[in-house]
């Protein structure tokens, strides 16, 4: 079985969630499969193994799981990027576009030092609004965003292209057509 098919087969698709017409790509089944989880993390890490990565930033919530594992393998620190109001210390924030409206994310102001090399990690990239906001937030405090990594890309929705337009290389392990 090829790597792509192996990983794709561990992702559960839930139709009409969270609303009619949406095909939700659920990675909890991938996370529960020890072999698939290890292979996915190894593949996310591979391009940067042996290079200097200072921090891995994970987007709430599934990006925490993947980002923590990636940070561990790279011997890098981990930085949580959370929804507004969830972090206890002084924060820096960024508004970002959602399908209907806007939201705000934040991180601790001292989580990344200027010039540190950071990889952004999340489970999936769709329209790219959240990831774009995270890149801008990291850059706002002086981070060098080396790349953005995802298990799943939904290329029809254009998110990866949006990040590449910001000069951020994008690594996705698998892609699903549609939304």
Curated annotation (Swiss-Prot):
Its main location: cytoplasm. It catalyses: AMP + diphosphate = 5-phospho-alpha-D-ribose 1-diphosphate + adenine. Pathway: Purine metabolism; AMP biosynthesis via salvage pathway; AMP from adenine: step 1/1. PROSITE patterns: PUR_PYR_PR_TRANSFER. One of its GO terms (biological process) is adenine salvage. Its EC number is 2.4.2.7. It is found in: Cytoplasm. One of its GO terms (molecular function) is AMP binding. Keywords: Cytoplasm, Glycosyltransferase, Purine salvage, Transferase. Gene3D superfamilies: 3.40.50.2020. GO terms for cellular component: cytoplasm. InterPro entries: Ade_phspho_trans, PRibTrfase_dom, PRTase-like, UPRTase/APRTase. It comes from the Bacteria. Belongs to the purine/pyrimidine phosphoribosyltransferase family. Catalyzes a salvage reaction resulting in the formation of AMP, that is energically less costly than de novo synthesis. Homodimer. This is Adenine phosphoribosyltransferase. It comes from Bradyrhizobium sp. (strain ORS 278). The lineage of its organism: Bacteria, Pseudomonadati, Pseudomonadota, Alphaproteobacteria, Hyphomicrobiales.
């Amino acid at each position: 079985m090829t790597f792509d098919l192996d990983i794709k087969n561990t992702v559960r698709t839930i139709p009409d969630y969270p609303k009619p017409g949406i095909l939700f790509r659920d990675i909890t089944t991938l996370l529960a499969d020890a072999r698939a989880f290890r292979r996915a993390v190894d593949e996310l890490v591979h391009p940067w193994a042996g290079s200097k990565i200072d921090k891995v930033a994970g987007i709430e919530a599934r990006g925490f799981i993947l980002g923590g594992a990636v940070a561990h393998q790279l011997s890098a620190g981990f930085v949580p990027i959370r929804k507004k109001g969830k972090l206890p210390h002084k924060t820096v924030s960024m508004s970002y576009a959602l399908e209907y409206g806007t939201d705000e994310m934040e991180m601790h102001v001292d989580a990344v030092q200027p010039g540190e090399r950071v990889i952004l990690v999340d489970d999936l990239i769709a329209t790219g609004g959240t990831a774009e906001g995270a890149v801008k937030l990291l850059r706002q405090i002086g981070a060098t965003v080396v790349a953005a990594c995802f298990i799943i890309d939904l290329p029809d929705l254009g998110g990866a292209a949006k990040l590449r337009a910001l000069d951020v290389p994008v690594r996705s392990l698998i892609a699903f057509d549609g939304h």
